[in-house]
């Protein structure tokens, strides 16, 4: 089942901020730079991917819901630290 969450990252971050986001991506478990996703390419049986949308950073994955929740919590914590602003579910 596909899990998804939109994080409160605007699509107009500066280049320096996007560089920090990219560094956080690479520090997360399962990062596959060649696919710009984690654990597998977007169409695989197990993956997490992120895309920049007008509403924020969309993170979605075909992965166990509890694993996804924990993984996204870690991603938010790392992004918060790297960017110096709180990153969380945009719909909260």
Where do the model's predicted regions map?
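Structured alpha/beta or helical-core interaction and ligand-binding surfaces enriched in interleaved
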Residues: 1-92
